[in-house]
């Protein structure tokens, strides 16, 4: 049937400049942030999935028959990761057994809603799910921690506790490989954060795609290391994936936000800056330090200022176990137990009146502001 040019039902003519730069057959719908390439929806799916597959194969992330836990939070990154890993596992026959592993930090109005998304993903993808909570592991929720120690320190606590919780959850499942949804933006932000803080020791390890602590049976990998956050969002949008998009209520206090803001400004000028920063981080290597001979136990070391120090053979190295909880630690007491000890001391000092009035809330706020942790 002929449709006259003036008829609104007539499809718009697609010019050569609007066609997909890969297939040259369909209209381009996506402009890739990574290289500004204009592609159609189907070609975008293909190149995005292929790039993730290439990252997995080039870095030899998985072994056939391996059981893998996806750190699932319900957010865009972990949701897309679970979807794509299941897809690629079936398409390329990786031979993996995939399990969803979620951590319940105990943040009312945030984590409870995101866990509802994870449970829907479990049904949608047909994957088993294991949920581990801070309350069960540490007898604290993040809301209780913030009430005791303040919002300024919230990400410090959560980072330490969450990392240990993932390892403990994997151990419960007898799984030795955890994959996380850290993307290229996250990796570049971590490099910037370590530079801004002058943390040279962590700078060298901040771009590793596969990590494993000495003595730990659990390794971690990041298949999205080179995937831009914007492309992950576009993939989730066009695939109509079910994910939770609300930011953690304590996230604005994190130092990472400073690095993220700097990254956005850089990306506006140079879109490739994210990958450039990652490659720069990969090229950084610490100069090897000359090894010192350790004096025998009980000997006296004379410092440069003339003072004396009695040498005691109490050094712990990576791969030792915490004396309290048995978790891997380079010290006698692991970081999590040290933080918990400080929280217990602070909790004893906080007196919360049984008052739901405005005056009671204000009094509690003033009490917490006086605490030093």
Curated annotation (Swiss-Prot):
* BP GO annotations: protein urmylation; tRNA thio-modification; tRNA wobble position uridine thiolation; tRNA wobble uridine modification
Which EC class is this protein assigned? transferase
What SUPFAM superfamilies does the record point to? Adenine nucleotide alpha hydrolases-like (SSF52402)
Report the function annotation for this chain.
Plays a central role in 2-thiolation of mcm(5)S(2)U at tRNA wobble positions of tRNA(Lys), tRNA(Glu) and tRNA(Gln). Directly binds tRNAs and probably acts by catalyzing adenylation of tRNAs, an intermediate required for 2-thiolation. It is unclear whether it acts as a sulfurtransferase that transfers sulfur from thiocarboxylated URM1 onto the uridine of tRNAs at wobble position. Prior mcm(5) tRNA modification by the elongator complex is required for 2-thiolation. May also be involved in protein urmylation.
What does the record give as EC number?
2.7.7.-
Cellular component GO terms, alphabetical: cytosol; cytosolic tRNA wobble base thiouridylase complex; peroxisome
Q: Which InterPro entries match?
A: CTU1-like_ATP-bd (IPR056369), CTU1_C (IPR032442), Ncs6/Tuc1/Ctu1 (IPR000541), Rossmann-like_a/b/a_fold (IPR014729), TilS/TtcA_N (IPR011063), tRNA_thiolation_TtcA_Ctu1 (IPR035107), UPF0021_CS (IPR020554)
Q: Tell me the protein's name.
A: Cytoplasmic tRNA 2-thiolation protein 1
Its family remark reads:
Belongs to the TtcA family. CTU1/NCS6/ATPBD3 subfamily.
Primary localization class, coarse: cytoplasm
- Keyword check for Secreted, yes or no: no
Task: Name the pathway.
Answer: tRNA modification; 5-methoxycarbonylmethyl-2-thiouridine-tRNA biosynthesis
Q: Which UniProt keywords apply?
A: Cytoplasm, RNA-binding, Transferase, tRNA processing, tRNA-binding
Q: State its location(s).
A: Cytoplasm
Residues of the signal sequence?
none
Q: Which CDD domains match?
A: CTU1-like
Species source reads Eremothecium gossypii (strain ATCC 10895 / CBS 109.51 / FGSC 9923 / NRRL Y-1056) (Yeast)
Under Gene Ontology molecular function, one entry of this record is: tRNA-uridine 2-sulfurtransferase activity
